[in-house]
Amino acid sequence: MATLQSLADLGQANKAALATADTEAPVHVQKLDAQGRAYATGKRKDAVARVWIKPGAGTITVNDRPVDTYFARPVLRMILQQPLHVANRVDQYDIVVTVTGGGLSGQAGAVRHGLARALTYYEPELRSPLKREGFLTRDPRVVERKKYGRKKARRSFQFSKR
């Protein structure tokens, strides 16, 4: 390690460190299986979604059923289609999803997480807009456990003063 004699030397050392940091940025490459599909998993609460995408007409199949029948509420369909809207890729990919565990809301969040990850595997340049919107980050919030001496996680038993 070189010794620094003045502030100018410190500035030069800092520029050299920044230059090496820029060149060592990870290069994301396309990850496809033998059938030309991108595969990713997504998680939310107790739900785990396995997502496969390939170029197509825009059909979304969840557990061998159309998305309109599996997620009957429009809000849930909107949640899982958010990555496609951010990436401007609506009706460009056929999506096949297998999702297990949790409730419908957690499953929709898991599908959204997996779909965003699969899109980045198919088109690595979409990583920055999807990351900016927070779709690539796994939501760490889970149900708090019940404690003994309490009715629920935080709710106490009813107290009678007399």
UniProtKB/Swiss-Prot annotation:
Q: Extract one GO molecular function annotation from the record.
A: RNA binding
Superkingdom classification of source:
Bacteria
The alphabetized list of GO BP terms reads: translation
This protein's record includes keyword Signal: no
Tell me a GO cellular component: cytosolic small ribosomal subunit
Q: What keywords tag this UniProt record? A: Ribonucleoprotein, Ribosomal protein
- Mind telling me which InterPro entries this protein's record contains? Ribosomal_Su5_D2-typ_SF, Ribosomal_uS9, Ribosomal_uS9_bac/plastid, Ribosomal_uS9_CS, Ribsml_uS5_D2-typ_fold_subgr
**Family membership noted in the UniProt record:** Belongs to the universal ribosomal protein uS9 family.
Q: Which PANTHER family match?
A: RIBOSOMAL PROTEIN S9, SMALL RIBOSOMAL SUBUNIT PROTEIN US9M
NCBIfam families, per the entry: PRK00132.1
Put simply, this protein is called Small ribosomal subunit protein uS9
The organism's taxonomic lineage, starting at the top? Bacteria, Pseudomonadati, Pseudomonadota, Alphaproteobacteria, Hyphomicrobiales
